[in-house]
Every structure is written in structure tokens, then in C-alpha cells.
């Protein structure tokens, strides 16, 4: 099996053609396209950009809210000189499930809207001519998929998504599509693990290939080779190694080659950063030194393109995070585009990488009812659908770790977001996931999950599995909001005192906290939704954080305003952003800039 999640790179032995651009597109509400031959000829199609969500490109609501099957179509040319190579199609992501056809022949199926997949089409393509590529996608939700939800049928027969999560169910081909020509024998995967020494660093590596020929591994600093080894497993010894650090990223070039005699059979290049990350004595240690996490929960979300990868937006986001003094973000609530991790590697940002396990609580009304315990949420992990959900969860977790394990920016894995975790089935569901994450990751990064408001120190059955505790807390917003901030602060302290008793030396971070603020809304004295109230809430919350030595990080919710399903609790989306959806600062951004640019990186370091 030649499955590989390596990022596509052109080398002396590999060829790439990007297939992004304007494709053809058509809805298939009756799911008749396969039988009707749409894989060869897509009828009544319109133009559609790739990558992008299709939703916000339309001006009619039925198209924007469409739920069901939909098709994409394009064509690609295969050069004659590619004959004798393996021809592979690679999709960065299709939300949420996809069937891929080439020249009318089905070549791949995939479920999961946030991770890549590929299809080998060597025996199907026609050389030196154009080939038809068709993708049948579907964006319906269910309780066996990640993220979780349901799909309802309206009175007029149309389907509509009913998510258990609080972000819009954007759909489409969201990330780049590549056509690749790869050698028959090739590098499929590699992994690294780092040790710091008195004279530099050692890099233990493992390389996976699909053939018998020998492997060499070299490390370059610019044009200078600084280490080399041979074999599919080995160690690179780097003298006077330059370490990767927060806002001081240093990257080396890794070159992996397969040799047959004097010929190079395959060559794969990547960039890596030498660093260690661990938890010791209740602190996060980067290269042995304490680091206090400050930053954001985010979303891949922007005007018009929805969740589609947009590199100018990515660049702007990193510039804003540098301006405000952040050093970390969580990929809430799904793995992001690979290009975002590459930029984090280059800019020196830390990432808590989250699998799309969100919506694991059922509510008869909406996410808020479930979060407050008012929904029909008990026993989410005791359903008939749970075994299938767990199987899909393990598959997504495996792909996320396989894809992202070599990024120096990735420091931890988040295995679930706000699951209902007070019922009897919690431990049986959690245990194999945490064991799988530890087994798959050669660097043994810390594992966590985010704890929702109704899961308390004495009721949460999942927290014992976490290497550090991640709390989502909204004292002063969803709980005791408004004029009673003093009561909110007292209740917050009461819960924190409870967590102090169960941490057993583990650090605790906040992965969500915040209030909605409609940009430009001011009120004196303050009221909820105003900029003044948002700042008062943040000052109170930060005072609570600073009171507890075991609090080792603060990731505010959210980096920017983002789109959600419409409803009476959302004013055209979630407005908890510190920046607007257009990436302009709200008043609270200046509060964070003042705090985060003055906090030392080792804030709350333990005195020896």
C-alpha cells in the first residue's frame, strides 16, 4: 500500500501540477448523478473556484444553505514523459465526504472534511491528452462523523444541516488539489525525534519506503551539510545546533534519498526545526525553558471564501498575532491547511493541534442549551452509533498525527472539543484515543481535550487521561453575565479551587474564554455586547488566571469574528473575536497587546 500524507513537493524525482482554479459545479439534490453519468458529463454546471467554500458565493439562500450531494469537474493534462511513473491525485480536503472519478472511473472514496487523501490513477489516465476529473461531495451531518450533528428535511423536501457545533457548516473543495508524478519506489513517510546535548543535538529518524533500496538522510543549514546518516532508521548528530524557538524559528533542510547504485531513485525534501517540548513540574518546557502560552482559539473562516484556503488571509492573521504578542493558537476545531503549519514553523508559533471531534453532545435546541446542561445531552457515548463514531475518530486522529508529526510548531494534540464527558461511557471512549495518540507520535507530545462548562473537577470522567487540563470557561458571559461580575468572579475562583485538588502536578490552560462584542458598540456604563463590558470581563478573567500558579496558558476565544448557523443568539455569526472578520482590531485587541507584550515568556516560572 502506497498511502502517504507527505506534503507535495517538487524535487529531482517528483513532478507537480496544481489543479486549483475555476472548476465546473452542480448541485445534485436527488443524488442521481452517479447513475446518470455525471462523472463523464456534468450537466447544467456553473463555474466554481477551487479552493473555496461554495456557500457564500451565492446570492440565494437555498444555494447557500444547500445540504446533500454536489459535484465538481475539471480536466487535467498528463505529459507523455510521465509514462512509467505513478500518477497520483492529491486533495488537501473535501468537506465532508468525497468520491473521486477519473475518466468516469471511480478511483477514491474519503470521509472527513479536514485532512488530505490521494488516489493513484496510473492505469486510468490517458497520456499526452486531457483527462476528466470529477468529484462527488456531500456535506450532510450525522452522529457518526467528525464533526457531529444531524441532517433535517424541511417541509419543501430540502435538506438542511443541523450541527451540534457553533460554527458554520461550510462545504466544498477547501484546500489545494495536486496532480503528482512520483517514482514507483519512493519515500512514503518519515518521522523525527530530538535530543539536546552539551555539544548540539541528536535527531533520531525513521523513514518508510515502498521498496528495497538503501536510504540516505542529510541535514543542511543553507547550502552547508551539517549531518548525514544512512538506513531507514538512524541518528543525525548536529554540532552547535541552532534551536527552533518562539518567535525565533530556525529551520534546517532535510533531504531523504533512495539510491539504486549511483542513481537516485527518489528524493524528498522538507524543512524541520530542532526543539524539544515537555511538561515537567507543572510547566511547559520548550528546549528546557518554561514557556507561558498566550494566544487564540481560531477558525479557518473569512468573508466570501468561507473555509477555503486563502494565503493573503493567512499572512494577515500571522502579522496580527505577532503584533498583539501571541505565541500560540489551537486549531479549533479541526486540523487546518498544511500551509498554515508551515507558516507557524517559519514564524515561531506554537500549535495545539485539534482533531475535528466537536459536537459530541446532543441538544434539542442548540449548542448553548447543551453547554448549559439544558439539552438532551446525557449518554452521548452510550449510543448504538458510538462504535462507528469511535472508529471514525481513530481514523481522523491517525491521519492528523501522521500528517503533522514533523512540524516543530505542533506541541500538543487536542483529541476532543467540549465533549459531554460526565456519563458512564466516557472513560471507555476516551482511553483508546489517548493510548492511540501516544502510540502514534514518535515525539510523545502532551495530549489534552477541552472541558466544557458543565464538566467540573468532581464530575468530569475524562480529565484523568489528559497530560494537561484545558478549560473552556465563560464566567461573566454565559454564566452570571452582566452587572453581577463580582458573583462571576467568586464562582470562577470556587471552581478553580476545585481544579487545584485534582491536577496532581499537571498544568492547566484556558482554551476558551471571552464575550461577544459587536464592533463599534460602546456604552457607559457598560452593558453586555459593548466594548467596555468586553474589557471589564477580560480584566476580571485575567486577574483570576494570575491568581493561580498552575494556570500556564490563556487562549482567548476567538481570534476573529466567524460565521455560525443563524439564530437568535448569533448576530450574523459569533462576535467574540478580538479582531473583526475583516481582520481589524476591536478595542480588546489593545488590552491584549498591552498584556501579552509585557508578560515574560516564562511568566509564572517555578522558582527553584
For each of these PLM feature ranges, what is it?
Residues 204-206, 318-320, 328-595, 604-605:
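Substrate-binding/catalytic cleft of secreted carbohydrate-active enzymes
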Residues 1-343, 347-351, 396, 411-412, ...:
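Secreted/periplasmic carbohydrate-active enzymes, especially glycoside hydrolases
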Amino acid at each position: 500500500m502506497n498511502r502517504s500524507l507527505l506534503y507535495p513537493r517538487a524535487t529531482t524525482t517528483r513532478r507537480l501540477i496544481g489543479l486549483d482554479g475555476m472548476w465546473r459545479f452542480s448541485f445534485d439534490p436527488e443524488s442521481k448523478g452517479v447513475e446518470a453519468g455525471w462523472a463523464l458529463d456534468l450537466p447544467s454546471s456553473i463555474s466554481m473556484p477551487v479552493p473555496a467554500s461554495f456557500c457564500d458565493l451565492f446570492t440565494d439562500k437555498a444555494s447557500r444553505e444547500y445540504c446533500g450531494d454536489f459535484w465538481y469537474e475539471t480536466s487535467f493534462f498528463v505529459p507523455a514523459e510521465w509514462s512509467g511513473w505513478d500518477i497520483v491525485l492529491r486533495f488537501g480536503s473535501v468537506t465532508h465526504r468525497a468520491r473521486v472519478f477519473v475518466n468516469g472511473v471511480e478511483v477514491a472514496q474519503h470521509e472527513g472534511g479536514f485532512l488530505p487523501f490521494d488516489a493513484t490513477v496510473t492505469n486510468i489516465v490517458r497520456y499526452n491528452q486531457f483527462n476528466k476529473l470529477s468529484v462527488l461531495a456531500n456535506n450532510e451531518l450525522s452522529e457518526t462523523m467528525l464533526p457531529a450533528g444531524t441532517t433535517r428535511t424541511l417541509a419543501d423536501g430540502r435538506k438542511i444541516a443541523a450541527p451540534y457545533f457553533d460554527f458554520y457548516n461550510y462545504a466544498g473543495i477547501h484546500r489545494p488539489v495536486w496532480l503528482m508524478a512520483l517514482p514507483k519506489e519512493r519515500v512514503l513517510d518519515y518521522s523525527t525525534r530530538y535530543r539536546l546535548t552539551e555539544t548540539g543535538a541528536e535527531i533520531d529518524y525513521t523513514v518508510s519506503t515502498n521498496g528495497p533500496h538503501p536510504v540516505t538522510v542529510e541535514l543542511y543549514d543553507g547550502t552547508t551539510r551539517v549531518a548525514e546518516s544512512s538506513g531507514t532508521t538512524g541518528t543525525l548528530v548536529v554540532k552547535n545546533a541552532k534551536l527552533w524557538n518562539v518567535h525565533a524559528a530556525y529551520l534546517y533542510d532535510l533531504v531523504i534519498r533512495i539510491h539504486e547504485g549511483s542513481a537516485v531513485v527518489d528524493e524528498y525534501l522538507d524543512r524541520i526545526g530542532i526543539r524539544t517540548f515537555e511538561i515537567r513540574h507543572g510547566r511547559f518546557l520548550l528546549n528546557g525553558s518554561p514557556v507561558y502560552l498566550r494566544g487564540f482559539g481560531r477558525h479557518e473562516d473569512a468573508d466570501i471564501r468561507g473555509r477555503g484556503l486563502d494565503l493573503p488571509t493567512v499572512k494577515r492573521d500571522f502579522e496580527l498575532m505577532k503584533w498583539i504578542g501571541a505565541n500560540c493558537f489551537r486549531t479549533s476545531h479541526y486540523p487546518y491547511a498544511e500551509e498554515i503549519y508551515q507558516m507557524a514553523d517559519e514564524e515561531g508559533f506554537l500549535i495545539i493541534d485539534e482533531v475535528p471531534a466537536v459536537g459530541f453532545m446532543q441538544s434539542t435546541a442548540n449548542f448553548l442549551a447543551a453547554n448549559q446542561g439544558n439539552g438532551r445531552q446525557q449518554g452521548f457515548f452510550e449510543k448504538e452509533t458510538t462504535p462507528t463514531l469511535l472508529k471514525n475518530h481513530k481514523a481522523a486522529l491517525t491521519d492528523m498525527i501522521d500528517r503533522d508529526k514533523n512540524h516543530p510548531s505542533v506541541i500538543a494534540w487536542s483529541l476532543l472539543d467540549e465533549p459531554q464527558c460526565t456519563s458512564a461511557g466516557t472513560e471507555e471512549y476516551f482511553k483508546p484515543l489517548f493510548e492511540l495518540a501516544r502510540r502514534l507520535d514518535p515525539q510523545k507530545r502532551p495530549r489534552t481535550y477541552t472541558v466544557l462548562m458543565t464538566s467540573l473537577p468532581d464530575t468530569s470522567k475524562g480529565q484523568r487521561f489528559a497530560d494537561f487540563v484545558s478549560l473552556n470557561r465563560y464566567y461573566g458571559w454565559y454564566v452570571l453575565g452582566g452587572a453581577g461580575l463580582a458573583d462571576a468572579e467568586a464562582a470562577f475562583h470556587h471552581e478553580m479551587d476545585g481544579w487545584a485538588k485534582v491536577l496532581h502536578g499537571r498544568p492547566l490552560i484556558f482554551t476558551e474564554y471571552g464575550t461577544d462584542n459587536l464592533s463599534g458598540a460602546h456604552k457607559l456604563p457598560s452593558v453586555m455586547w459593548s466594548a467596555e463590558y468586553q474589557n471589564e470581563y477580560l480584566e476580571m478573567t485575567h486577574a483570576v488566571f494570575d491568581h493561580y500558579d498552575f494556570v500556564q496558558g490563556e487562549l482567548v476565544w476567538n481570534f476573529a469574528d466567524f460565521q455560525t448557523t443563524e439564530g437568535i443568539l448569533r448576530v450574523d455569526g459569533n462576535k467574540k473575536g478580538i479582531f473583526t472578520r475583516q481582520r481589524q482590531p476591536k478595542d480588546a485587541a489593545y488590552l491584549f497587546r498591552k498584556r501579552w507584550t509585557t508578560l515574560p515568556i516564562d511568566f509564572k516560572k517555578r522558582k527553584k
